[in-house]
């Protein structure tokens, strides 16, 4: 279910404050966050945000095509190791 338009997009307060502070200073620094549910806003474009995936923080460079998506969409939490290859020689006839 989509979020109500009257509420607006969710962005963690601490993350928004850090972004606004860096925009005022015109600095580009990696911002570490655990807030995977925060929505990407246009003021975040050009910043690098390190999003936690459960084990480590993955740096993500924010582009204009990412606006409206969540931060967690760009840091995968599961490792896909590939499907097991079936060995037909070891099978019984």
Swiss-Prot record:
One matching Pfam family: Ribosomal_S19
GO biological process assignments: ribosomal small subunit assembly; translation
Subcellular location: Plastid, Chloroplast
Cellular-component GO terms for this entry: chloroplast; mitochondrial small ribosomal subunit
Gene3D superfamilies registered for this protein in UniProt: 30s Ribosomal Protein S19, Chain A
Span list, region Disordered: 73-93
Ranges of compositional bias, category Basic residues: 80-93
Stored SUPFAM superfamilies: Ribosomal protein S19 (SSF54570)
Keywords recorded for this protein, A-Z: Chloroplast, Plastid, Ribonucleoprotein, Ribosomal protein, RNA-binding, rRNA-binding
InterPro entries per UniProt: Ribosomal_uS19, Ribosomal_uS19_bac-type, Ribosomal_uS19_CS, Ribosomal_uS19_SF
Gene Ontology terms for molecular function: rRNA binding; structural constituent of ribosome
Family: Belongs to the universal ribosomal protein uS19 family.
PANTHER family named among the record's database cross-references: RIBOSOMAL PROTEIN S19P FAMILY MEMBER, SMALL RIBOSOMAL SUBUNIT PROTEIN US19M
Function: Protein S19 forms a complex with S13 that binds strongly to the 16S ribosomal RNA.
Name this protein carries in UniProt: Small ribosomal subunit protein uS19c
Gene that this sequence comes from: rps19
